[in-house]
Amino acid sequence: MSLGLLESQLRLKVFGRLQVIRQHLRMTNHTVKDGECLLTKAGCAGVITLNRPKALNALNLGMIRLIYPQLGLWEEDPETYLVIIKGVGGKAFCAGGDIRAVTDAGKAGDRLAQDFFREEYILNNAIGTYKKPYVALIDGITMGGGVGLSVHGHFRVASENTLFAMPETAIGLFPDVGGGYFLPRLPGKLGLYLALTGFRLKGSDVQKAGIATHFVESEKIPSLEQDLVAMKCPSKENVADVLDSYHNKSYAAQDKPFVLAEHLDKINSLFSASSVEAIIENLRCDGSSFALKQLQTLSTMSPTSLKITFRQLKEGSSMSLQEVLTMEYRLSQACMKGYDFYEGVRAVLIDKNQNAKWNPELLEEVTDDYIDSYFTSLGNSDLKL
């Protein structure tokens, strides 16, 4: 072998090793810290435990990259019959995505702003199309990304500790993770109301709204989990029977009327308008204390987010989950290039002074052409499911 050829091969080896190191460094910037997401096998079940209690189990990219492939392995494993996902810490199932990290990445032009949304939505789709029973124990705060980890699965078990909301219009975003799919499929205009106002549902109301499938008292959830993992080769029907049994014993919560029951007629009529502006006008004309409260709430939200969200749910009502997630990825990337998302995060999560200065500031300044741009195809960069 000539000296020149040997030197050439050595350079190639060194270059290849440097490429591997660079790739590793890029990946470890967003990998999961030890123990942030635990993946275990218990009896017949694969168990996902979100383990960031100090961050209210907020979902980061590293956790997504652990959960997604493991779901695929369990789906093909003949010894795994169901999947259970839960959070630790006593306060939250999952309070959302790691918005701070996404915000910083968006400002810096880091590809995390693309990767996070793309891989999160791919995970949402995997949950929504999962072949085996998927049980989310949403015993605590469940917002944003936490909704995406639960609502598309077969079973969602709420407790008195559950706090559900999709508050994205307050931070210049939109109710993503498939919100355009499940929200317009709630009864009447309830989903649109929740999406625009960010109204919070608690406890058994989460089940009454149709977001959770079952309600079980928090103290009984460990026993429920034990009964689920102890089953022998359970079918989806067997899992449902166990969940139904626990739910049916929770009479106290079922006896309470739905928190929005007295307002549903107004919600269905006032929010059935053909535009956000028309909804605002309906609320003004109604003049009831309920309507005036909604006006006050909507006045604090990003006008751009309100219009994006209205169209998102309107179009999503006739789309498949895959089509919705593709649409939402386009919206996410448009928001990353805009202004309101960063301003909303500053006002709500960083400075916490709630005084966001939206741009455009008024609903009438948000043109149809501007909203159209948010829904434009990304071509080769579109989400592929």
Curated annotation (Swiss-Prot):
Q: In which domain of life is the source organism classified?
A: Eukaryota
Residues reported to bind substrate: E120, G145, E168, D176
Against CDD domains, the record matches this protein to: crotonase-like
GO: which molecular function terms?
Answer: 3-hydroxyisobutyryl-CoA hydrolase activity
Task: Cite a single Pfam family from the UniProt record.
Answer: ECH_2
Q: What does this protein do?
A: Hydrolyzes 3-hydroxyisobutyryl-CoA (HIBYL-CoA), a saline catabolite. Has high activity toward isobutyryl-CoA. Could be an isobutyryl-CoA dehydrogenase that functions in valine catabolism. Also hydrolyzes 3-hydroxypropanoyl-CoA.
Q: What is this protein called?
A: 3-hydroxyisobutyryl-CoA hydrolase, mitochondrial
